[in-house]
A protein has these predicted regions:
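A sequence-level detector of short, solvent-exposed, charge-rich linear segments
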Residues: 20-27, 42, 50, 89, ...
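Mid-to-C-terminal Rossmann-like scaffold of FAD/NAD(P)H-dependent oxidoreductases
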Residues: 2-83, 133, 138-147
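A short, polar/charged loop-to-alpha-helix boundary motif
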Residues: 79-96
Length: 147
């Protein structure tokens, strides 16, 4: 929108789309994509981390290159912050760093189950990592839902 406005006002500005982002909500279903997450990928060049909540209505996938730098994320059934993943992808964070800080990406953490705790445990089990899984905040302990 901003680029279009500049160009309509005769101030030529190049279009720089930035990191791909898409978010959709249909009734109570949340779905978000950050960065590049194709439906298929070359397993020799791309590492995949996938976590699914046991009832099957919430999941998280992160793709990384062979250096374990984040390429993109899909999440289904819970909300995460766009700004967090925009920064992580732009700055080429490692998958470990993304997962270690995943509590910072949690949207409305006081009111939703802290899925990031289970995601962090699953990532450590699959890829290892030198981080401690986050803990619930005082507000989450007091009012929040559980996983």
């Amino acid at each position: 929108g901003e680029t279009l406005a500049h160009n309509l006002c005769k101030k030529t500005v190049p279009y720089e789309p930035g990191i791909w982002f898409n978010s959709a909500k249909f009734f109570d279903i949340e779905y978000q994509t950050y960065g590049t997450v194709p439906s298929t990928w070359d397993e020799a060049e791309t590492k995949s981390f996938y976590w699914e909540h046991s009832p099957g209505k919430v999941c998280f996938r992160m793709l990384m290159n062979t250096n374990h730098q984040i390429l993109g994320v899909n999440n289904f059934g819970f909300r995460l912050r766009h700004e967090f993943f925009d920064q992580a992808i732009r700055e080429k964070w490692s998958g470990e760093k993304v997962i270690a800080k995943l509590d910072k990406a949690n949207f409305d953490p006081e009111f939703f189950a802290p899925y990031y705790l289970e995601i962090q445990k699953a990532f450590k089990a699959q890829f290892g990592g030198n981080f401690q899984p986050a803990k619930k905040s005082f507000i989450q302990k007091l009012f929040g839902a559980s996983v």
